[in-house]
Amino acid sequence: MLKRFFITGTDTSVGKTVVSRALLQALASQGKTVAGYKPVAKGSKETPEGLRNKDALVLQSVSTIELPYEAVNPIALSEEESSVAHSCPINYTLISNGLANLTEKVDHVVVEGTGGWRSLMNDLRPLSEWVVQEQLPVLMVVGIQEGCINHALLTAQAIANDGLPLIGWVANRINPGLAHYAEIIDVLGKKLPAPLIGELPYLPRAEQRELGQYIRLAMLRSVLAVDRVTV
């Protein structure tokens, strides 16, 4: 059984957090213990408790065990620190240890990335290098919009070039007015080398909703049932 997997997106703001929420809720509905993990979060806000990131808070809220914020998001970067122009080291040992600790506590850990597959951290390294180091299977979120077929195929190819398995993809309808939605899904289904795990419709305030119903549970169980996935 795959205990942990990584969520990437075809771009920034394509819905990685709401898809992560949907996956966590779907797995929890099957009696699984789950935890969300956001190793590096940009654009965090100062609060009385310290820096907090809204995406990480969503993941914390749908984890099935009580976790301190730092266990969900060990590295929170402020808005000023979030630009790649602001150079600072990233403690990869810290985020690896955090992932290992969560993996011991739950059935599944959903690890949400930052930006797209090649988005750079403040040390000018893509987080994907850490994903390769951890040998995490990858699930891709495709924001359904103009140009998404190109972005999805390029992202899938980059993941394969890095030697990691793409175990599935989820379509997120971020543009409700987009024509030819069904045709886009059909083309992606034919061209991507992994199964469609779910389709999220356009929903206002999706990060506050029950989203597990939009995940194809049988397909999700199938891709997670193996001990190890190869490319």
UniProtKB/Swiss-Prot annotation:
Has UniProt tagged this entry with the keyword Thylakoid? no
- EC class of the enzyme, as a word: ligase
**Protein residues bound to ATP:** 13-18, 55, 112-115, 172-173, 201-203, 208
Going by the entry's taxonomy, the superkingdom of the source organism is recorded as Bacteria
Binding, Mg(2+): 17, 55, 112
Record-level GO cellular component terms:
cytosol
Keyword Secreted recorded: no
**Active-site feature positions:** 38
Q: How does it assemble?
A: Homodimer.
Write down what this protein is called: ATP-dependent dethiobiotin synthetase BioD 2
Query: What is the organism field in this record?
Result: Escherichia coli (strain K12)
